[in-house]
């Protein structure tokens, strides 16, 4: 079992498909007309594009250092002359399927992830202090855009709701995520399950126009196979499912294959640095491995994993993958650390 080493498959495929500089857009479309007085006669549709970082400006700055926000959309709508809206704000999450989770939670909301949505707002949290989850993410996001418009001095007559955007709705404004390179860094450094489950659906969205966990997992597996690292099975994007399986050899082949790709610098930068940041910060704080090894950790009940790269004292770069099943994760980590110290210490 891979545990969160599954994220190596998800993020490498996302980088390859989108490119390191790509950004995910959340846009506002409209079905009306704007007159010279600033009245928009019609309704506005907030269309999610699968951005895991979208939300309020304050939340995005605190959590990610910035990202797409409802405040940006409100200011841009005002900038194009909108002063009032006769209709209402609709939230549209239809670029993803309606399933809120992965197979580990029977496709319902997982307490380890939160509600997955094509129009995710503040990670699906019901409040900015992190308490509770949204029952209806697209309606929640629409209400937050409505509130942001009100603060900007734009009056909206109708109450916000969730609905699919009608054909022919015109694009008005958009806001964008950080780059894909940053999104996968946020995913891998801290082992972010929410970002990983959003990104696996983004894979399917980019390929087929509809974001699904199953479709994205198939694409991630196919990409790894092209690099010689095809897994036994991938069931989700984060590694919460015990159906994510591969041998250490296959993980190592994926990692080695990434070294020859243009996206490798971004992929390498996304991994935790031993003793310094991410999930490896509390580990390997001394010895040859500190600062010389980068990796992705993984933990489930009875499962512990770490895979990545070590630059040894000799200057040679070693690819490693250690997947341990049927173990006590705490004790397993100690053994893994000794192995990485040995690799990094090669002269």
What would you call each of these model-derived segments?
Residues 1-136, 152-185, 189-195, 205:
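Active-site-adjacent loops and short helices of periplasmic peptidoglycan-processing enzymes
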Residues 9-12, 71, 143, 218, ...:
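Residue-level marker for well-ordered alpha-helical positions
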Residues 13, 75, 147, 222, ...:
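Surface-exposed charge patches
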Residues 15-19, 146, 150, 259, ...:
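Short amphipathic alpha-helical signal-transduction/dimerization elements
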Residues 24, 143, 305-306:
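Residue-level marker for the onset of beta-strands and adjacent loop->beta junctions
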Residues 70, 138, 142, 329-337:
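Short, charged, low-complexity patches
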Residues 115, 125-266:
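A small/polar active-site loop signature that marks catalytic segments
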Residues 200, 204-347:
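Small-residue-rich helix-loop
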């Amino acid at each position: 079992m891979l545990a969160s080493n599954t994220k190596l498959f998800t993020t490498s495929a996302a980088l390859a498909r989108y490119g390191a500089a790509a950004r995910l857009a959340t846009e506002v479309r409209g079905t009306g007309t704007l007159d010279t007085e600033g009245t928009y006669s019609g309704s506005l549709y907030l269309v999610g594009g699968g951005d895991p970082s979208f939300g309020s400006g304050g939340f995005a700055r605190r959590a990610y250092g910035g990202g797409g926000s409802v405040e940006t959309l409100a200011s841009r709508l005002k900038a194009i002359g909108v002063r009032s809206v006769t209709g209402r704000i609709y939230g549209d999450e239809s670029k993803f399927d309606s399933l809120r989770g992965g197979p580990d939670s029977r496709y319902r909301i997982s307490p380890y992830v939160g509600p997955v949505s094509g129009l995710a707002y503040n990670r699906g949290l019901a409040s900015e202090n992190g308490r509770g989850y949204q029952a209806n993410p697209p309606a929640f996001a629409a209400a937050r855009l409505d509130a942001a418009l009100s603060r900007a001095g734009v009056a909206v007559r109708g109450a916000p709701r969730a609905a699919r955007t009608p054909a022919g709705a015109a694009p008005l404004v958009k806001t964008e995520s950080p780059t894909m390179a940053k999104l996968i860094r946020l995913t891998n450094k801290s082992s972010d399950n929410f970002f990983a489950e959003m990104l696996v659906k983004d894979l399917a969205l980019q390929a087929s126009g509809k974001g699904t966990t199953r479709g994205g997992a198939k694409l991630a597996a196919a990409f790894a196979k092209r690099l010689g690292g095809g897994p036994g099975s991938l069931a989700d994007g984060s590694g919460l499912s015990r159906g994510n399986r591969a041998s250490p050899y296959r993980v190592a082949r994926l990692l080695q294959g990434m070294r020859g790709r243009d996206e490798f610098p971004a992929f390498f930068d996304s991994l935790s640095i031993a003793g310094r940041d991410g999930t490896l910060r509390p580990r390997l704080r001394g010895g040859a491995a500190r600062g010389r090894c980068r990796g992705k950790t993984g933990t489930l009940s009875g499962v512990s994993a770490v895979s990545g790269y070590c630059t040894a004292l000799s200057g040679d770069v070693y690819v490693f993958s250690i997947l341990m099943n049927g173990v006590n994760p705490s004790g397993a980590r100690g053994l893994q650390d000794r192995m990485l110290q040995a690799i990094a210490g090669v002269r």
